[in-house]
Amino acid sequence: MIDWSRSYSCEWRVFRVDPETWADGARLGGVDSLEVQSDATGDVPLLDAGGMTVSGDVPPQGYYRIALTARQDGAIERADIATLLFEATGREVGRGTASVTLSGRSTLWPAQARLLTGGEYAPAGTDGAAWAAALLRSCCHAPVEVADGAGFALRDPVWGEAGASVLSHVWDVVRAGGRTLRVMGDGTIVVAPLPTVPALDLGGDFAAIIDPTARVALDVSEVPNRVTAIDGANVAVATNEDAGSPVSHQARGYWYDVVETSPTPAEGETLGAYAARRLRELSVVSDEREWVRGYVPGVRVGDLVRVAMGGALDGTYRIRTMGYDLGRGVTVTERASREVQLWV
C-alpha cells in the first residue's frame, strides 16, 4: 500500500468508459493537460467537473476516467481521481498539429439536464433514499448505490416543481432525510448519510498541510442580537446579552433586530421559546478555511476533515470545494467550513 504522506512517483492515464458496463475501455492518448474540481456548494451541486486538452482526434463526447497509478518502494496503487462526461468545446489547428479542448461534467449531469413536467412527488412514508436512487438510475449512465444506513422514511411528501431538474428534486428528497449525494472517483453515484466521522486527520494520520497559510472567513455582520415574534396580540422577544458573545448587545453597543410577523412554532412550543430558538438559529455562522494539502484517495467533498496541528486551524471542518493540481503527484486546494454558534 502507498503511504500518501510520503513522496511517490506516478503515471496519469485517461480511459474511455463503456457506458453499458462502466468498465475501463481504451486508453486515451495525446492528453496534454488535465484539470478536476469538486464543489458541494449551492442548491443543486453537481459535485465534480473538469477539463482536458488532447492532441489529435478524439470523439466529441464520452465518459472518461482519470486514473493515477502511484509507485513507492515497490508498492503500486491505482486511484481514480474522477470520471466525467466530456464534450468537445473547441479545436485548434496548427501547421501539422491539432488539439481538442474538452469540458467535463459530473456523472450526475444527465439528471440535471432532464426537467420535471409537473406533478412528480415522493409520497410520505416512502424510503427517500431508494426513491432518489431510482430517479437517478432513470437518467444517469453511472452506477447508483444506496449506502448502508442511508434509508429513511419521508415524513411529508416532497413535490417537484414543473421546469425544475430531476437532480434538484433528488436533492430535495435526500436533504429531507438529512442525507446527501456522493460521486466517487470511478463515477459511481451514492445516496449516503451525511458523514459524521472525519475521513482524514491532518496532523495525525496524514501530516502535511503544504500551505499552512489558510484563508479565514467568519462573517458575523448579518447576525441579529434580538428577535421579536409577533402573533396577533401576542409578542415575544429573545435577546442576546451574553458578554462573551461577539454579536451581543454589550459587544456591539446596539440592537440588531429581526422581527417575525408570521411565526411558525412547533407543536407545543410557546411563542417565547420560538423566538429564542430563532435567535439561536440565526446566530450560527460559517467559519471557512482554505488550505493546500497532499492527496489522499477516497476523500471527497462533503467529507469531514480534522485538523490537529497545534495552531489556529485546529478543528473539524466539512469539505466544500476541492481543486486538484495534477502533476508529478497530486495536491489539493481545499475549502472547508464549520458552523460556529455565537449565542446559545
Task: For the regions a language model picked out, list residue spans one by one.
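Beta-strand-rich assembly/attachment modules of structural machines
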Residues: M1-G125
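A broad structural signal for short, well-ordered beta-strand segments within beta-sheet-rich domains
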Residues: A26-Q37, A153-P157, A207-T213, I319
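Charged- and aromatic-enriched interaction segments used to assemble
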Residues: G94-V220
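Short stretches within intrinsically disordered, low-complexity N-terminal or propeptide regions
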Residues: Q72, L84, G90, V144, ...
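Glycine-centered structural positions embedded in regular secondary structure
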Residues: A82-L84, G104, V144, G272-A275, ...
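Short beta-strand and beta-hairpin "edge-sheet" elements
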Residues: R71-G104, R182, R306-A336
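Acidic, small/polar-enriched beta strand-loop surface segments
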Residues: M1-T21, W171, G185, P193-V330, ...
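Oligomerization/assembly interface segments of phage tail-like spikes and tubes
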Residues: D32, V36-D57, T97-P110, V173, ...
